[in-house]
Amino acid sequence: MAENSPLKAHNLRPAPGAKTAKTRVGRGEASKGKTAGRGTKGTKARYQVPERFEGGQMPLHMRLPKLKGFKNPFRTEYQVVNLDKLATLYPEGGEVTVADLVAKGAVRNNHLVKVLGQGEISVALQVSVDAVSGSAKEKITAAGGTVTELV
């Protein structure tokens, strides 16, 4: 780049000597030939040391603890609907079914639904869903409603 030319992106070049060719080792007896910088003999010269080998130190995969427990294949997962959500969806009370909740967008179709007791309810609801928690059942019956569990 000439001394007087302005500094622009299309004029930029790497500094001289900044970009050097990759050294190809083990090609003939010149520099980095023959033993290719590995020294003579020994395990490290023979490409038999795995990358994970830590030189006799306890390996990382053995230093970490094993995972405990297991994943239960028979676990049932429910979609959760709380009482405060039911109070906003049904302000006048009435019948609450899984199909109604799907239609109102509270839950997805073809999944089990469980009503939990977070929040308060003051209207009578006739709830028929897959499962209901104990606290939710108490609050619904105290408000004058009924509970039917499908499962």
Swiss-Prot record:
Species annotation: Streptomyces griseus subsp. griseus (strain JCM 4626 / CBS 651.72 / NBRC 13350 / KCC S-0626 / ISP 5235)
Molecular function via GO: rRNA binding; structural constituent of ribosome
Pfam families listed in its UniProt record: Ribosomal_L27A (PF00828)
GO CC annotations on file: cytosolic large ribosomal subunit
Top-level taxon: Bacteria
This protein's UniProt keywords: Ribonucleoprotein, Ribosomal protein, RNA-binding, rRNA-binding
HAMAP family found in the cross-reference section: Ribosomal_uL15
Listed GO biological process terms: translation
Segments of this protein annotated with the region Disordered: 1-60
Entries under InterPro entries matching the protein: Ribosomal_uL15, Ribosomal_uL15/eL18, Ribosomal_uL15/eL18_sf, Ribosomal_uL15_bac-type, Ribosomal_uL15_CS
Subunit structure, as described in the record: Part of the 50S ribosomal subunit.
UniProt-recorded name of the protein: Large ribosomal subunit protein uL15
Extent of the signal sequence: none
Function: Binds to the 23S rRNA.
Family: Belongs to the universal ribosomal protein uL15 family.
